[in-house]
Amino acid sequence: LEPTYPIVFFDAIRVKIRDEGSVKSQAIHIALGVRHDGCKEVLGLWVEPNEGAKFWLRVMNELKSRGTNDILIAVVDGLQGFPDAINAVFPDAMVQTCIVHVLRNSLDFLSWKDRKPVATVLKNIYRATNAEQAEKALTAFEASPWGQKYAAVGQIWRRQWAQIIPFFAFGPDVRKMIYTTNAIEALSAPLLTPRAAFTHHIDVTK
């Protein structure tokens, strides 16, 4: 592996695997690195039943043992303990929570008819010009009728705030790159077609 990666995306996808006559959903965890030349490189695929901080700590140690000494920006989902797992091995890495994950989790609390208007209001947070303006937008949302109706949404953003705001330190081009782990979803799209089902988890990694 490269000694340093400017950006590494960490996420999981679910694929269908045939097992003893039945088809089961299996999590495949992916690390996708962006090299200094801008090219993307799959750093590893791991099959693990449960995504947890201990598992990701093992992944970080594996990347370190394979030659990577530093990650500048790690883009992750909102798993509790994930930032600690990364910084335990790469202490200088900036951990950025995927804004799209936070948004999706927020909308899960809403009735269907309320999702579009609330999503529009939440854009004021992650499209703010800087972290200070973003926090003002979050506070305004919490005080609004929507925020009062769905207090859990504001709590989701508050809990992950330290990992939400790092991308405000960068310009629009970099922000667009790191605010989501969709690069992994695009990479894995062929695995997620309705007809795709693998006979063994090893087939997925080939």
Residue ranges and their predicted role:
Residues 36, 46-56, 61-65, 110-117, ...:
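A detector of single, family-specific signature residues
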Residues 34, 62-66, 88-92, 105, ...:
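Conserved, well-folded catalytic cores of nucleic-acid-processing
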Residues 127-206:
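Acidic/histidine-rich catalytic cores and adjacent linkers
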Residues 1-76, 80, 84-85, 89-92, ...:
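RNase H-like nuclease fold core
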Residues 73-80, 85-123:
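Conserved beta-strand -> loop -> alpha-helix junction used to position metal-binding or nucleic-acid-contacting
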Residues 7, 25, 50-57, 76-83, ...:
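Amphipathic alpha-helical transducer elements in NTP-driven molecular machines
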Residues 41-44, 68-70, 119-126, 138:
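Short acidic, glycine/Ser/Thr-rich loop/turn "cap" segments at secondary-structure junctions
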